[in-house]
């Protein structure tokens, strides 16, 4: 059975690799940090469960929560919303800028956010399709 939040089934063969876009996830987060104007363009296109990196998924959940309430999405507001949404994880998360730059990923500005969003959506749909096929094949 798949975990709805991360879409990781417990019985998935080790030889099967699910598609993911970790660099695009980090670039999208960095783009949102760099330009708050990017969020309204993509808010209706993304959901936290589309992200494979759990810390980035939580940050996106915070961004979308604030956006949905019509509140500002500056870094302090996002970090405060993360603490509200997940107090048990909030203290364990790295700084949002560090999270976006982990693994030495090159910084990307807000102008590419829409394209990175598309990469993330495509990988999410592919993961769901693979997992559903796997589930049906093993019923």
Which residues make up each language-model segment?
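Noncatalytic partner-interaction/assembly domains of nucleic-acid and motor enzyme complexes
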Residues: 2-123
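Amphipathic alpha-helices that form helix-helix packing interfaces
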Residues: 129-136
